[in-house]
Amino acid sequence: MKSPLLRTLFASVLTALAAVASAAEPIKVLIIDGRNNHDWVRTTESCKATLEATGRFKVDVSTAPAAFAKPQPAKPKAGDAEGKKAYDEAFKAWKKEESDFNKAHAGDWDKWSPKFSAYAVIVNNYNGPEWGAAMKDAFTDFVVKGGGLVNVHAANNSFTGWDNFNEMICCGWRGATFGQRIAVNDATGKAVAVAEADEKIKTKGFGSGHGPKHAFTLKARDAAHPLMQGIPTEWLHASDELYHRMRGSPDHMEVLESSFSSEKFGGTEMHEPMVWWAKFGEGRVVTTSMGHLWAGDKSFDALHC
């Protein structure tokens, strides 16, 4: 029987982030979703069910305006001149439909304005277009004034050009020229910057990545931290993506758990951060790179175990 340790950790994190809330009242949580290259619908359902099952949380969901859903035309085989001509015409028509849709729904983004201040914790399950200035300011103000924030998996892929968000998450899925490459020093358990010359595995490009999904061991780096209570010092996570070479700054990053990224699974032969937290103003921000789920995936183990 699989042990639901990731769900236990998730609930513990949100409880600790909302420690100032009255013990008699449920902790109010808002999940942000609607755009993501992953299956954000089922990820949100899983997060919501996990929290509500504890009886400690009241969970609401705020979903971004819908994207243009019609898939792009399929590309023809190489050398198929007639197919290429038909594809070009179909793609041109598709682009016009997409443009017309976006124009018709441009005002939807102005109407999307979650009331962050009404909640103790925000769960970020969003990886899509950058928000408008007013929404970004409200989000920043929420965290600065003491709100809790939890970023799930691909949420740390987003908002590359938003300085406040980059400071909140410390490191994320970024290109090779962004910030510093972050790893975990196995001896100290601390986040460290790694120079390209010190990489143990040399590959083309040094931006963020991952190898094939596989099960891997999580190692506690701050077992005494309140967020880690009830979590073993080592535990086996189900098959998931093990992010490596995430980039940003280690300056105020506190690692809670890491995993060894093995070359056997396309990894770096270094310890990579899996769960970490940071202060931002009076708020606390927790980020986990775990929780991969594509649309159509039949296994939810990466979200549960």
Question: Can you name each region flagged by the protein language model?
Answer:
Residues 12-22:
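Hydrophobic h-region of N-terminal signal peptides that target proteins for export
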Residues 1-13:
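Bacterial N-terminal signal peptides that target proteins for export
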Residues 34-37, 127, 204-206, 211-216, ...:
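Active-site rim elements
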Residues 148-150, 256, 286:
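Structural detector of well-ordered beta-strand residues that form the stable sheet scaffold
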Residues 24, 28-32, 39-159, 293-297:
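Helical hinge/lid and interdomain linker segments adjacent to catalytic or ligand-binding clefts
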Residues 52, 58, 105-108, 118, ...:
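Catalytic beta-strand/loop cores that center a nucleophilic Ser/Cys/Thr
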Residues 115, 121-124, 128-229:
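A glycine-rich, often tryptophan-bearing local segment used as a flexible ligand/cofactor-contacting loop or short
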Residues 279-285, 290, 305:
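Glycine-rich, aromatic-lined ligand/substrate-binding cores of catalytic
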